[in-house]
Amino acid sequence: MGDVRTQLTPETPGRAAILNPFESPSDYCSLHEPFVSSPSVFKPSKSAATPQQFRWSIDQLAAINPIEIDAEDIHRQALYLSRAKTDKETEERRQKAIEEFFTKRTIVPSPWTQHEGKPAAPFHSTKCADLIHESPVGRVQAVQSGKSTVGCQTHLSLPVDFNLEKVLGEYFRAEETADQSQDNLSSSSLRRKLFLDGHASGSECSSPSSPPQEGPYYDPPAALGVLCSIDLSPVRCRSPTQTPSSGQFSSSPIQGGRRAFSLGSITSPTFLEKSPASVTSPSFSPIAINLGKTPDAEQKRLIFPSPETLSASTSMVNAFTRNPYIEGCSPIKSIFQIKSRSCRGNAPHRTSLFQIPFALEPHSDDKENSPPSSIKSPEGDLSSLFHQLENIVPDGHVMMGGEPIVSPTVYMQQEYLQSEELKENDTVEMVEPVEIEEEHSWPKETVATDNIPMASFMTGITFSGESSHMCMSPLAESSVIPCENSSIQVDSGYNTQTYGSCIMDGIGAETTYKENDTHISDIQNKCQHFKVKDISSVDCKNQLLEPESPEFQHSTQKSQNKLARYSLNSGMWKLTGDGAINRLNKNGGVQSPPRTLNPKSLSHFLQ
């Protein structure tokens, strides 16, 4: 053990080694390694010394040295206290001291008040104070630094019992107008505010009211007053600077191109339906916007693949993939070229093929604003179109391998012939969609009519119109369109509205009025009839892509000055009237269904 102890070197020189009795001597060799000390090493020691001063508790003192209290002393003390309360001078002196203490001295200091007799704390150090006194601006700031203006009392003092209406009535009296009737309350309701313009409006939106009384807090209202206070409509209304004549929306029917704007029971005169060229009204009706009456219709004319303007656009098929609900609230968009002229009597008119429900949107803004180059006068356009089509395909159909290819010229010529024959019957039932297996297939069941369906541009729904026959959307299932008196009534799921003055203005369709002039008579003399034959899609595609081949030229010479009739699905068009049925039986019976026609080949053929 002695040898082991001599080998140990304490960490601190001159300090005796502390041996732990709980450790064995064999562990001394590992003391230089870190280890966990035992609890006995850091145990605090208690000192046995007594405190310097000792005090007995109250209970201990009472038990050690008890004191006897005499009853006379208690009675004498009570008598003294009773006499002291009756002394008025002493009581007044005490109350005066109490009032002086609470009135002249602040018990709870307020940061808004300046205390008297209390020196202001220095805001700056000694060096800063010297600089302030040297500068004249600093001296002014030093004087004003300890002052503050705080309002602690109201200008109007109210007594305990007061009449609030009498005191505050002249300051908070609402300005009442003369016409506070039920009519104004109904017109200013939330339902009416939804259709009002929040910014401002013209005088056509509301009837003239009496001028309000002027008051001290009178604020001049806007033109609509209460009616145009809040704009709660989710659809942005047109501002009065943009629409000087067209007011707000109304549910009143259209009467001869004029609309009577009404708000509740407040009536107002009718105004013409016109809008500036820079802004178009939003579409709230299932029937599309009338492009014929708006001034911007002359500048913005969209191109649609009609028989006249089929070759004017090259991006028609891609436009159908867009969302039909991008513009406006109506799923129906009518995009046609509008050609109008004076109509004599019951002159026939023709509608172009159009697509529903997809809207046709050009890709560029320049094409929308600029008029198409293919629009001409009806006489010059038709004559030049017939001339071009006759030069391309002089025959009514081309025979190749036993399958005919029908020329669009024949369709145009026969359309004029049938327009004269079908004038007396102007009623067409609702168009039904055709279920197809492929994207560009023709319907299987066919019936002989006088129209050509553009199935390649319709994606399953084929519509056509000629003479006075109209085509409506499949959404309006209960629509009946009498076209004799130029009036239609449409129930499209939103509401029922009656439109007059012109059929084509109601649906925005392309309308071409034609006169019985010498040009039509010349076309009728050149036209001949012959039977309908099947159209082969393969032969049609090959023949259209190679119009200059010898076989094409040979076949066109055989079928010169002939006219073909087309076959349509019986479920797509339903002609009512004995005259139409008799003409169908006279011209030809039901033929075999035509085959698939490629849209690219047809567009290339017409170009």
From Swiss-Prot:
<feature type="region of interest" description="Disordered">
    <location>
        <begin position="362"/>
        <end position="381"/>
    </location>
</feature>
<keyword id="KW-0132">Cell division</keyword>
<comment type="function">
    <text>Required for the activation of aurka at the onset of mitosis.</text>
</comment>
<dbReference type="GO" id="GO:0007088">
    <property type="term" value="P:regulation of mitotic nuclear division"/>
</dbReference>
<dbReference type="Pfam" id="PF15280">
    <property type="entry name" value="BORA_N"/>
</dbReference>
<keyword id="KW-0498">Mitosis</keyword>
<feature type="region of interest" description="Disordered">
    <location>
        <begin position="584"/>
        <end position="607"/>
    </location>
</feature>
<dbReference type="GO" id="GO:0032880">
    <property type="term" value="P:regulation of protein localization"/>
</dbReference>
<comment type="similarity">
    <text>Belongs to the BORA family.</text>
</comment>
<dbReference type="InterPro" id="IPR023252">
    <property type="entry name" value="Aurora_borealis_protein"/>
</dbReference>
<dbReference type="GO" id="GO:0019901">
    <property type="term" value="F:protein kinase binding"/>
</dbReference>
<protein>
    <recommendedName>
        <fullName>Protein aurora borealis</fullName>
    </recommendedName>
</protein>
<dbReference type="GO" id="GO:0060236">
    <property type="term" value="P:regulation of mitotic spindle organization"/>
</dbReference>
<keyword id="KW-0131">Cell cycle</keyword>
<dbReference type="GO" id="GO:0051301">
    <property type="term" value="P:cell division"/>
</dbReference>
<dbReference type="GO" id="GO:0005634">
    <property type="term" value="C:nucleus"/>
</dbReference>
<dbReference type="GO" id="GO:0005737">
    <property type="term" value="C:cytoplasm"/>
</dbReference>
